[in-house]
Amino acid sequence: MTNEAESSAKIIVIGVGGAGNNAVNRMVEESIGGVEFVGINTDKQALTLCKAPTILQIGEKLTKGLGAGAKPEVGEKAAEESIEELKQIMEGADMVFVTCGMGGGTGTGAAPVVAGVAKEMGILTVGVVTKPFKFEARTRMSNALMGIEKLEENVDTLIVIPNDKLLEIVDRRTTMPEALKKADEVLQQAVQGITDLINLPALINLDFADVQTVMTDKGIAHIGIGEAKGDDKALEAVQQAVSSPLLETTIEGASHVIINISGDISLMDANDAASYVQNLAGEDANIIFGAMYLSLIHISEPT
């Protein structure tokens, strides 16, 4: 076994329910490296569309493969029926992402159970979920809020992306399928922003232990991505990242921050970016800095 194999973290991304499966499909299409993908659903037919190498139909006895009927309690019981299979899938993992769209039956009900299993196994567990549009049924939003609350209790860190925020970044002529695809893209960026920190080569290296320090038992998190070029590219990119229009959180008062800068930057560029974040987060914030070869900035901020 090589040193690289010995030191690499085993990361699993689990998409739960229809929206979670769609998000995983996008990540598979984007060829995110160093990650294993799993699709979980109560709907047997929907699972046939999932591109994850590993798929699991949960609650087979309970739902007969026909889905959760938009009832979170059914999704929850389905996951509980399949606890042993979930444990097998997550065996040996160092980090598990649980992603879903909150408000329906399977994702809302099953995701907290899936996350709870991971956390009980001692795995660093991160939830990345979307919240429904306000124009959707009131029941769907109330289910989502309940699911988010339960999920937060069962993860180390939770990133919540309100679908309503998509309205701030899309054109009025954007179709519903296009908007939902954008939501999948945001979920993918949130996950990839963290996994790239661990898996990709860097000038100033960040590793799994750094991510673990920032994300273990930290609650709600903020993750932003920015891109810029020109004389002040690092500062401009970091300003974009901390003011992400897709999130309800801010980095003010953050206890821990990871700044990961990618691209050709000078020492002064790095200093300007780090100083800007330190001023926003506060002098007590623990800031971990990394520099990569690509062209994005990722900031993760658990409060």
State what each model feature region is:
Residues M1-E301:
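Tubulin/FtsZ superfamily GTPase core signature
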